[in-house]
Structures are given as C-alpha cells and as structure tokens.
Amino acid sequence: MFKSGFISIIGRPNVGKSTLTNEILGEKLSIVSCRPQTTRNNIRAVLTRDDYQLVFLDTPGIHKPRHKLGEYMVKAAETSTDEVDLIVFITTPEGEISKGDELILEGLKNSKKPVFLVINKIDENPQELVAKTLKQYSEYMDFAEIIPISARKSKNVDTLLELMIKYMPEGPKYYPEDMITDVQERFVVSEIIREKALKLLSEEVPHGIAVEIISMKQSKRGTYHIDANLLCEKDSHKGIIIGKGGQKLKTISTYARQDIEKFLDAKVNLKVWVKVKKEWRDSNFMLKELGYKE
C-alpha cells in the first residue's frame, strides 16, 4: 500500500519550522536564520520513499503584519491549512501559552484535520519548562499527537516522521520520485543569498532586504553565471551591506556561492550588487516582481 498526503507546518516566527523541514528532507530548501519571519513563501517540499510520499508546506510565521509583505506572509500561512491531510503546529518551551500561539490555536480548534503539537528546541530548555509547556498546551485543546523534539539535533524527528506517515491516507505519487521541491531553481538561489545576508548583517537591516535574480545562465561547460541584486530600503543600509572596502558584500557572496554550488551540483560564478528600492515591502508592483504576490 502506497501512502501520500500534504502536511502543513505552521507556528509563530522563529520556532524552527524551516529547520524541521530541512532536517526531514536532508536538503536545505527553506531559509534558516536566528531572526524571525525569514520564510516569506509557502515552500512545497517533497519526500518520496518506496511506500510513501509526503508533501510539506513550510509556511511563513504567523504574526501581526506591519506592511503589505507581512499581510501576504500571514495570508500564505493561514491558507496553507485548507487542503492538507495533516497540520503540524510547532512551538517552543515557554511554560505559558503566548498570545501569538493562542491566535493560531483558536483557528485550529475547529479543524477537521488532525493536528500535531510539536514542542521544538527541547535541547535548549530545562525539562521542567518542557513538561509545563506540554501540560499547558494539552489542556488548551486536543491534539492527535504530542511530540517534543529538537530539530537542530534531530532528536525525536524520526518518531515524528513515523507518526506523520501513519496519519497519511492511501494515495498516488503527486510528484516525480527525484523531485524535492516545486519551486524554481532561481527562487532557491535567491533564498540562499538572502539567508547569508540575514546571518551576516546587523539587526537594523535584514527584514528590509530582498534578492532579485537578474540573470541565471548555464554555460556549455556546465558553469552557472548568476547576476543578482540585493535590495534594501534605505541609503544608509546600502553602506552597511557593502561594508568597508566591499568586504561584507564579498563575504555574503562567497558563502552564498558555496551553498548554491552544493544545491546546483555545479560550478557557480556569482555577482551580487546592492540597490536601494525605498518602501518595496509596501509596493504591490515590487512584491509581484519578486514573486511574493501573483
């Protein structure tokens, strides 16, 4: 019997949704950063084995939006639960139920789909706090399964995966066996560049940045030549991103190129420029150009 289905992974920003997706797949598809709200699109990732296929939707964190990009991110996350077979709600040990989690759980209480509670980052918190969190959430609503994990250290992730498969219906292969994501290569490349920028830049810049792939061509010898714009909203941010003598931008580009080469399994020649696009997060035109809106 072949089982298949769709799984929505939801939660507040920075609870480890992307880390979990990447750990399950063994591939770096979703952007991972210590800063919240780094995932901006629903990333559809595919895990295929001999007897099952799981399709994961790694969603943006649900939060109170402050601009049009934020509105898009929240809408993308909320609509991801409409047509799935299983909802995986992720949180972290905090003892009390946060207002952000309460908002999400209220929307899940009447769901006809099974909902898993996954408590992530148990390796970073005292057992007493983990136990208190489990008690608080299990009393708040009924969950199909409750699994404490550490996505970063892969603790209990295999157990979670086994339970996911258990809840999947019998079904077809929705995607080819060798397919791991339905997003275009250009999108993954842009996300890799953005991830490196998020990790290397100061707090004041990151959420105002985006990456625009201008050109991506493969030569006859197999080398990819990629030109990209790293967009920011303020002139002052441009200098921070470039850094003294261009060193910061060079570091971002070097780290990004290394990961892009792993993803494409080919040599990469990457050129990145910094451009100022004021208030791009509130521009419908720019959001469409960058692929955040249809």
From Swiss-Prot:
Residues 3-170 form the Era-type G domain. It is found in: Cytoplasm; Cell membrane. One of its GO terms (cellular component) is cytosol. Residues 120-123 are annotated as: G4. The keyword GTP-binding applies. Residues 37-41 are annotated as: G2. Residues 201-278 form the KH type-2 domain. It is a peripheral membrane protein. Keywords: Cell membrane, Cytoplasm, GTP-binding, Membrane, Nucleotide-binding, Ribosome biogenesis, RNA-binding, rRNA-binding. Residues 58-61 are annotated as: G3. The keyword Cell membrane applies. One of its GO terms (biological process) is ribosomal small subunit assembly. Residues 149-151 are annotated as: G5. It holds the Pfam family MMR_HSR1. One of its GO terms (molecular function) is small ribosomal subunit rRNA binding. An essential GTPase that binds both GDP and GTP, with rapid nucleotide exchange. Plays a role in 16S rRNA processing and 30S ribosomal subunit biogenesis and possibly also in cell cycle regulation and energy metabolism. Belongs to the TRAFAC class TrmE-Era-EngA-EngB-Septin-like GTPase superfamily. Era GTPase family. Monomer. PANTHER family: GTPASE ERA, GTPASE ERA, MITOCHONDRIAL. This is GTPase Era. It comes from Clostridium novyi (strain NT). The gene is era.
